[in-house]
A protein has these predicted regions:
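N-terminal capping/lid subdomain adjacent to the active-site entrance of alpha/beta enzymes
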Residues: 1-171, 178-185, 189-193, 306-326
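Mixed-charge, polar/low-complexity N-terminal
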Residues: 4, 13-15, 20-22, 75, ...
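Catalytic core of soluble alpha/beta enzymes
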Residues: 148, 153-289, 296-297, 303-315
Length: 326
């Protein structure tokens, strides 16, 4: 087995701002696995920045286990030598792609998804000026679900602008840990009246227990507070939805396991992304078959996408082509 690791940078159309800061481009690693017969599998990862992951740290992790991987690896042994995170995600997704190519079997079938459906993704509007948020909302007025990034100071005004421009859309609000429970309770009634259907990770990871005091009616989704199945116990009874992201789980293998266990516990599932290219969205679409909410809009945020990229029609995602992945 040959392992190749490449670093790439994908500029955004406009700088993308969330409560933690802004970025002009997304840096990713792409792992390519090639077997002795020339079959190739690819996987992309951006890593988890709030866990301190960088391109350099992910590449270092992979170089440390290169000899083991080049001797041959499967999903179980991969999970034993790499922790959850971007490095394992890239290899795990490349391995799914490789096995699909080796067996000439669609990845959906390998994952136990008999009849994959096209998914409807939300589109994300970053933190910006009133004019920019309003313009963005008008651009996506026909999309059924709009996600609005907010922070501790800018919240209701942005949601009002989106509602005015998109009267029929559902709205997801994402503070990225920027609120506390008191602010959440103050905002919740108007958020409900504005048609907000979900609030993602309102409070910081580690302060989840404060949500025992939440009095609102809008559902809450755990994002930064849950990486993989080990985090489910922390959020039960506090959140109603779990945001599954492959960079957090360490790949599609654990993402599927997390989604299935969350559903068994009575939680709904959201499948999100780290704003990658279509190569990262494709395995996300497999996990998305188990989700009530889908946020796989990464390619639309970039100035350009990969060859054979996933096509979007007002949020409706085309199933990925095998030439891309799977």
């Amino acid at each position: 087995m040959k392992l190749r690791v490449d670093a790439e940078s994908w500029p955004y159309k406009v700088p993308f701002r969330v409560s933690r800061g802004a970025e002009a481009a997304l840096d990713v690693i792409v792992v390519t696995l090639e077997d002795s017969s020339g079959h190739i599998g690819r996987g992309e990862a951006a890593g988890v920045d709030y866990h301190g992951e960088t391109i350099a740290s992910m590449k270092a992790q992979l170089e440390a286990v290169r000899p083991r991987m080049e001797c041959g690896i499967d999903f179980e042994s991969l999970a034993a030598i790499l922790p959850p995170g971007g490095a394992r995600n890239a290899v795990d997704c490349a391995l799914w792609d490789l096995i699909a190519k080796q067996r000439r079997t669609p990845v959906w079938e390998l994952a136990g998804v008999a009849n994959p459906r096209r998914l409807t993704s939300s589109i994300t509007l970053g933190i910006d000026t009133d004019a920019a948020v309003a313009a963005g909302a008008r651009r996506y007025a026909e999309w059924p679900l709009i996600k609005v990034k907010v922070d501790g100071k800018r919240h209701l005004d942005a949601v009002r602008l989106v509602r005015a421009a998109c009267p029929a859309a559902g709205i997801i609000v994402d503070p990225n840990q920027a609120w506390d429970c008191d602010l959440l309770n103050r905002l919740a009634p108007e958020l409900k009246s504005l048609g907000v259907v979900l609030i993602e990770q309102p409070v910081p990871h580690g302060e989840d227990a404060t949500l025992h005091g939440y009095t609102g009616e809008v559902r809450l989704a755990a994002d930064e507070s849950v990486d993989d199945r080990a985090g489910l116990a922390t959020v039960q009874g506090l959140y109603q939805v779990v945001n599954v992201k492959l960079d957090k789980t360490g790949g599609l293998t654990e993402a599927l396991a997390l989604a299935r266990e969350a559903r068994a516990l009575g939680l709904q599932v959201m499948v999100g992304c780290m704003a990658g290219t279509s190569l990262a969205m494709a395995p996300g679409m497999v996990a998305g078959q188990l989700a009530e909410f889908v946020d796989l809009d990464g390619p639309l945020l970039h100035a350009e996408d990969r060859e054979h990229g996933i096509q979007y029609d007002r949020g409706l995602m085309q199933l990925p082509l095998p030439a891309l992945w799977g």
